């Protein structure tokens, strides 16, 4: 809403995106991707703090998430074709611990435009675009397996997700991979899909907890005009509560633009795993409760957006029962809780 289609000059606020509008800030790498960009700049004897938003977007060029591209393109990486996941994971660990890496060029080329805290690369698998994640320095070494198990559980809960795989490793149980939902193969070409995160739409920082699922429900209805999309968001909220996914910040919810229908829809869910946020609470509150949300809080959120109590309760119980079967009874949730607090 900060950029309506009117012939006027609009000046962005400095906060929260350092002088960028949300739609463009979404293209900028954060977390791991920004770390790679800054390390590459330092290697070229450039102070990262002196690089403004426009130049950072030029570095993203045509490699960013979603459909937006930026010109002119600043190229500061080389390209390599061979991908060895264990070796790249080892280089990721080096970068997280120090500024040295033999494969900084390759890692930047593969993951320099990605967001999120965990190391990741953007790559091709069977000719299609995928994201492959590696453990961060404080992660359980088998976090890839856990995220894969979470993805299987989410799908059984009725949550839409892109295709996921557990990629083989000799160092751990495997690396988590997911097909990109902002790229679609069409008649031998790759079509880029417009996407916007909730952070970009509402222009709020994902680093500061400021949202409630009540807001997400209203936003989903306003953008999509479709109650089935609202129910998708509700189901995702239930899942996040029951599986202890508390890093549910504003960049972990995204909408895709459907050019054929001329409207927005909720993107497939992503970044679903055992996690905590600031103070161990949910980054997005459930009816004001981020610490210990209960079924009563969940049902109030549903009621406020107009989902019937019977349907809301049925969805919540179905999700909870599936989580119990797939993650609780199998010990996966308990093991992750132990891993976090040992």
Question: Residue ranges of each PLM-predicted region?
Answer:
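Phosphate/dinucleotide-binding and metal-coordinating scaffold of catalytic cores
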Residues: 1-250, 254-342
């Amino acid at each position: 809403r900060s950029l309506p289609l009117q012939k006027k000059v609009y000046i962005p606020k400095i906060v929260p995106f350092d002088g960028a509008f949300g739609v463009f800030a979404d293209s900028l790498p954060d977390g791991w991707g920004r770390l790679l960009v800054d390390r590459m700049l330092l290697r070229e004897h450039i102070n990262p703090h002196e690089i403004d938003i426009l130049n950072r977007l030029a570095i993203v060029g045509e490699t960013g998430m979603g459909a937006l591209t930026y010109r002119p393109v600043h190229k500061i990486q080389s390209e390599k074709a061979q991908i060895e996941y264990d070796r790249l994971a080892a280089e990721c660990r080096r970068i997280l611990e120090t500024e040295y890496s033999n494969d900084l060029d390759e890692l930047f080329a593969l993951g320099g435009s990605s967001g999120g805290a965990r190391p990741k690369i953007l790559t091709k698998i069977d000719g299609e675009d995928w994201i492959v994640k590696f453990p961060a320095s404080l992660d359980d070494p088998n976090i890839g397996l856990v995220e894969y198990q979470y993805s299987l559980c989410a799908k059984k809960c009725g949550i839409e997700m892109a295709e996921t795989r557990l990629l083989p490793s000799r160092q751990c149980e495997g690396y988590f991979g997911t097909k990109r939902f902002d790229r679609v193969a069409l008649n031998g070409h790759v079509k880029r899909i417009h996407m916007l995160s909730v952070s970009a739409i509402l222009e709020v920082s994902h680093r500061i907890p400021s949202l409630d699922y009540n807001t997400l429900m209203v936003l989903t209805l306003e953008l999509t005009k479709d109650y089935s999309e609202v129910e998708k968001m509700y189901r995702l909220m239930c899942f996040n509560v029951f599986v202890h996914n508390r890093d549910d910040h504003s960049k972990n919810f995204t909408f895709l633009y459907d050019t054929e229908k001329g409207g927005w829809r909720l993107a497939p869910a992503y970044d679903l795993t055992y996690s905590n946020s600031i103070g161990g609470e949910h980054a997005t509150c459930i009816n004001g409760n981020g610490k210990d949300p209960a079924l009563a809080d969940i049902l109030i959120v549903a009621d406020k957006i107009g989902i019937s109590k019977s349907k809301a309760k049925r969805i919540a119980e179905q999700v909870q029962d599936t989580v119990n079967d797939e993650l609780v009874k199998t010990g996966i949730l308990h093991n992750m809780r132990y891993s976090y607090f040992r």
